[in-house]
């Protein structure tokens, strides 16, 4: 073979390789990160070894800003807010192992915000509320990492770590600062042969949150706070009084923490997949000898999925059910001083709050190989809460919310058009009892208007819609603009004094990203 023919063949080979890479890249960008992650059932569960059941490598990075306004809002929502952030994610497959990773950072600024001091209102059974609207800043950091390794032809071993941290501050008296940490670690193992795959995972989770408050400068005002012990029953007082526990000797702020342990089991037979999970948790509020509240709980969940493959498309059927219960006990404590040494004694506990939450849903999705999709489904959420803060009064509340949703993504050349819609309607029932023959001086204090506003917001008929348009440049770069609006469907709406009675909440967002 002469040199001229050799050079010609090398040139042809390079042309073929370049064309193959271009074709592969076009297919890759058609399958965005969220679609690649969603099409594999294992990715929605605890077992990271499910990464090895797929082979498509995909990554993305994006920057985004958004602005939120409008009067239809919960009592914990600000009047207006904007945020900016960056995030990235990757799923990578190599010969013997696969990896998933993601990180994000977001800074949010809220105007005329008050209500719960917690970064996650309602997560813990005890919460602190303040009533002076001001500016709040929230910085959120998150990290996800997971790896799955083939030990041999049948066994796989892996683990996944999910970590998040938040700094949440208010810059107007009554000022407060909130530090939140959340970590979940799930080591897993999988056995597979042919069309059958079996997996199991251990789940460990730790959450913690500390709220500190302060008053700066000289002011003639008196700032009040409220401790919610369930169903908005609790104590309202000057913020630094001991009954609220925000500023108490020997304790830094208002610290809460929760540890969760449990496990999950997975099975896949051909195109059918299911996962069952059971978790137990123990939490407390306070520190050292001064543990004011202890809360224990458990949860169970089931996921069932089925895939129907077709020519250039696949149908997905998904079902979900979960239940979570939690009891909160208030400890009876007293500071005792002996020989100049002060210790805290515990005399007993009172069960003051119990809650149970059930979530169920079903979904059908049509996913095309081009990346277009259509899905629709329905969901049901039930919250049952019982407050026994003051004997002999018993107060219960039950709220059921039903929703139907649909979303579609279609492509027009370089444009992606996505539309989401969700309609929900709920109902609630409250009951109040008092044990007969037991005298009581007064009923427990309640922020009734706040409870009414939050319940009305949760259960009222409303529609949530989102429209987004993405333009895909060459080599995976894209620019996306979106609008999301939520509107109540009824005219009458119970609100807290000072909150707008608007019917719509708007969110506009702009994102630039890169798929690679």
Residue ranges of each PLM-predicted region?
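Outer-membrane beta-barrel translocator domains and adjoining extracellular loop/strand segments
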Residues: 71-77, 112-118, 168-176, 211-217, ...
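Outer-membrane beta-barrel "beta-signal"
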Residues: 191-193, 503-516
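Outer-membrane beta-barrel channels and translocator barrels
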Residues: 94-97, 150-154, 192-194, 270-272, ...
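N-terminal, post-signal peptide beta-strand-biased segments of exported outer-membrane/organellar beta-barrel
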Residues: 25-111, 124
């Amino acid at each position: 073979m002469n040199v001229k023919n050799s050079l010609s063949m090398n040139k042809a080979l390079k042309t073929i390789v370049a064309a193959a890479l271009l074709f592969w890249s076009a297919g890759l960008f058609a399958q965005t990160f969220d679609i690649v992650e969603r099409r594999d059932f294992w990715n929605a569960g605890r077992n990271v070894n499910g990464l090895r059941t797929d082979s498509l490598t995909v990554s993305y990075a994006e920057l985004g800003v958004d602005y939120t306004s409008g009067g239809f809002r919960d009592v914990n929502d600000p009047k207006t807010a904007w945020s900016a952030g960056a995030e990235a994610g990757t799923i990578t497959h190599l010969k013997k192992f696969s990896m998933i990773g993601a990180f994000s950072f977001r800074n949010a600024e809220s105007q005329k915000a008050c209500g719960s001091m917690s970064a996650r209102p309602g997560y813990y059974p005890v919460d602190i509320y303040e009533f002076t609207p001001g500016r709040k800043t929230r910085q959120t950091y998150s990290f996800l990492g997971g790896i799955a390794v083939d030990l041999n032809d049948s066994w796989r071993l892996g683990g996944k770590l999910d970590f998040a941290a938040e700094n949440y501050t208010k810059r107007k008296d009554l000022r407060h600062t909130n530090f939140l940490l959340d970590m979940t670690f799930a080591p897993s193992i999988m056995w597979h042969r042919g069309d059958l795959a079996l997996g199991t995972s251990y789940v460990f989770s730790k959450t913690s949150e500390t709220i500190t408050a302060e008053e700066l400068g000289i002011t003639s005002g008196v700032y009040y706070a409220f401790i919610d012990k369930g169903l908005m029953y609790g104590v309202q007082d000057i913020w630094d009084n001991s009954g609220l526990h925000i500023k108490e000797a020997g304790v830094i702020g208002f610290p809460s923490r929760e540890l969760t342990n449990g496990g999950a089991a997975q099975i896949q037979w051909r195109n059918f997949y299911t996962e069952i999970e059971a978790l137990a948790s123990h939490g407390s509020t306070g520190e050292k000898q001064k543990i004011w509240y202890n809360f224990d709980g458990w949860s169970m969940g089931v996921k069932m999925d089925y895939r129907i493959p077709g020519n250039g498309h696949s149908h997905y059927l998904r079902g979900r059910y979960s239940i979570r219960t939690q009891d909160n006990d208030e400890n009876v404590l007293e500071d005792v001083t002996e020989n100049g040494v002060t210790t805290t004694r515990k005399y007993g506990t009172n069960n003051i709050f119990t809650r149970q939450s059930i979530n169920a849903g079903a979904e059908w999705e049509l996913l095309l190989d081009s990346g277009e999709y259509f899905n629709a489904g329905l969901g049901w959420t039930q919250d049952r809460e019982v407050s026994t803060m003051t004997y002999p009064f018993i107060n219960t509340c039950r709220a059921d919310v039903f929703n139907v949703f649909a979303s579609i993504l279609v492509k027009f050349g370089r444009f992606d058009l996505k539309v989401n819609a969700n309609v929900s309607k709920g109902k609630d029932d409250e009951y109040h009892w008092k044990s007969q023959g037991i005298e009581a001086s007064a009923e427990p204090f309640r922020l009734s208007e706040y409870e009414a506003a939050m319940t009305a917001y949760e259960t009222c008929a409303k529609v949530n819609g989102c429209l987004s348009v993405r333009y895909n440049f060459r080599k995976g770069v894209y620019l996306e603009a979106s609008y999301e609006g939520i509107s109540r469907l009824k005219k009458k709406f119970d609100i807290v004094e000072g909150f707008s009675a608007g019917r719509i909440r708007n969110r506009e967002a702009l994102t630039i990203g890169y798929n690679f």
